[in-house]
């Protein structure tokens, strides 16, 4: 950090932003043992950049974690890695307000030494855990593309949980010395929270920082580059179709994702580590003051890029994870459809829906709440001792053939379109706003289609009625079946108890006294149930 007193071979001093740069350079030329920095730019750059990362990164990462938890269960290995990556980004973003205050107040830290150590720890913990989780994702995707059979057999979510625990443990152990090095230094007018350490310990800190950089950045960087290079080579292999060689769209999309990840990795992490290493060793070697100033400015500019990784990771989730992309799009569409429906009702309060061709879907018996009998007596009170007879076989058959009707109308549901005002067109409902020529023509087409559909339904209904009249299927109660057979009564009766279950009897298979009612598939799923005897109303 530039707020640290530099541990070079000559004495160095930090300036305030109030001294002009020309005077500082003249002072540097006159005294060879003094190198003066002008760091006024960072008091504007860092607060603004950290504030932007906080305002953008916090909602994005919280939304990502919510989608992972609420919309994407159960998790696969990639989802496990991405959730831990989002958790790491969220913890770091939550620490940024303290740094915004620190740099806006010109290197004044009023929060104490413990919080200073914690904030610096979170920065490097997020930095290196992000790199390691991206490495895990890269290795997992490489195995899935280049070795799909072995990856399915050997890699699952449990293994991913273990790997993530090892990543957190490794990063924490590697950064424990950083908690010891980082400290605060009280000055006359302010208190400095060192990003590195005190000047007398700076040489040892550089050695430690170099080892951590090679272990947690250098090696993962090589692994990521190797995995994505091999994946690109595998995906670039075309598929031979006849005499032509084509590259499928999913392979092109995967290659674009790889390019995006590599560019994001290069922008966020590479410049920061290169300029930081140059800055540390330039201070140790005691190079010329002008060159040291240039390296210092470059290092400060690249620090916001490392923090911006917390905002780029959610974009990576959207591009690299198909499940995340589908869940996010579905959630956004559901949220946006609610105000559209409200606007539709408020903008057209007097319009009445008109039914188009085809019957409406019938609610299944399980969806009807039941508190006893659906039949009411003369006093209007519900009773379990009453029964209603249904003599209209068409209503019964409509219930029995509900699934076939819905399936027949499924093709109409797929033809959903947008009306003139951009609102969703609802199936079987048409809102007439204007009686113009085009509307009348569409109504004529709708009438023709409805007549055809009604004709088909009538033909199907006739066939079912003929079956009922022949006695192939019969609806009746248990004890009343014998009486109905003697009288030749074929009128089906409806059971109004409970969930209004429809019961189907096959009299040829059972005796007159021991008849069982077989539930319709929608309600009973093939289970048999005895009908209870209720007196006819």
UniProtKB/Swiss-Prot annotation:
Stretches in topological domain Extracellular: 1-49, 101-118, 183-210, 276-292
Keywords in alphabetical order: Cell membrane, Disulfide bond, G-protein coupled receptor, Glycoprotein, Membrane, Receptor, Transducer, Transmembrane, Transmembrane helix
Metal-binding as UniProt keyword: no
Keyword match Disulfide bond: yes
One Gene Ontology cellular component: plasma membrane
Biased composition (Basic and acidic residues): 409-423, 431-447
Chief location bin: membrane
The name this protein goes by in its record: P2Y purinoceptor 4
Family the UniProt entry places it in: Belongs to the G-protein coupled receptor 1 family.
């Amino acid at each position: 950090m530039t707020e640290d007193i530099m541990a070079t071979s000559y004495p160095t001093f930090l300036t305030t932003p109030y001294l002009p740069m020309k005077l500082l350079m003249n002072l540097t030329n006159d005294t060879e043992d003094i190198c003066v920095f002008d760091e006024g730019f960072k008091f504007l750059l860092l607060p603004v950049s950290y504030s932007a990362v906080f305002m953008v990164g916090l909602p994005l990462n919280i939304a990502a974690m919510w989608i992972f938890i609420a919309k994407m269960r159960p998790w696969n290995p990639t989802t496990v890695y991405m959730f831990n990556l989002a958790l790491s980004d969220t913890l770091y973003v939550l620490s940024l307000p303290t740094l915004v205050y620190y740099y806006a107040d010109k290197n004044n830290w009023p929060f104490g030494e413990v919080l200073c150590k914690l904030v610096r720890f979170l920065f490097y913990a997020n930095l290196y855990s992000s790199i390691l989780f991206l490495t895990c994702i890269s290795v997992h995707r490489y195995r899935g593309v280049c070795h799909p059979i072995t990856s399915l057999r050997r890699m699952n979510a449990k293994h991913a949980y273990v790997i993530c625990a090892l990543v957190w443990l490794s990063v924490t152990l590697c950064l424990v010395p950083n908690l010891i090095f980082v400290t605060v230094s009280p000055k006359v007018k302010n208190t400095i929270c060192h990003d590195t350490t005190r000047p007398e310990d700076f040489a040892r800190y550089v050695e430690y920082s170099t080892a951590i950089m090679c272990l947690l950045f250098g090696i993962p960087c090589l692994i990521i580059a190797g995995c994505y290079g091999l994946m690109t080579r595998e995906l670039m292999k075309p598929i031979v179709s006849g005499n032509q060689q084509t590259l499928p769209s999913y392979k092109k999309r995967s290659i674009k994702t790889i390019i995006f990840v590599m560019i994001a990795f290069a922008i966020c992490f590479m410049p920061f580590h290169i300029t930081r290493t140059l800055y540390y060793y330039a201070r140790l070697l005691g190079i010329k003051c002008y060159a040291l100033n240039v390296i210092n400015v470059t290092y400060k500019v690249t620090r916001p890029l490392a923090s911006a990784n917390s905002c780029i990771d959610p974009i990576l989730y959207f591009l690299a994870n198909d499940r995340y992309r589908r869940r996010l799009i579905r959630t956004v569409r559901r949220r946006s459809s609610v105000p559209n429906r409200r606007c539709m009702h408020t903008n057209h309060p007097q319009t009445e829906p008109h039914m188009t061709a085809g019957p409406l879907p019938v609610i299944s018996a399980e969806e009807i709440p039941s508190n006893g009998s659906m039949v009411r007596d003369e006093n209007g009170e519900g009773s379990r001792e009453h029964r209603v007879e249904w003599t209209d076989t068409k209503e019964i058959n409509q219930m029995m053939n509900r699934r076939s009707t819905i399936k027949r109308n499924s093709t109409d549901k797929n033809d959903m379109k947008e009306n003139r005002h951009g609102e969703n067109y609802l199936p079987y409902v048409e809102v007439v706003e204007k009686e113009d020529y085009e509307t009348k023509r569409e109504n004529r087409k709708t009438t023709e289609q409805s007549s055809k559909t009604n004709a088909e339904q009538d033909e199907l209904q006739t066939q079912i009625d003929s079956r009922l009249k022949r006695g192939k299927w019969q609806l009746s109660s248990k004890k009343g079946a014998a009486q109905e057979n003697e009288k030749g009564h074929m009128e089906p009766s409806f059971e109004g108890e409970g969930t209004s279950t429809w019961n189907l009897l096959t009299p040829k298979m059972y005796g007159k006294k021991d008849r069982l009612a077989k539930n319709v598939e929608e309600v009973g799923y093939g289970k048999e149930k005895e009908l209870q005897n209720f007196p006819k109303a």
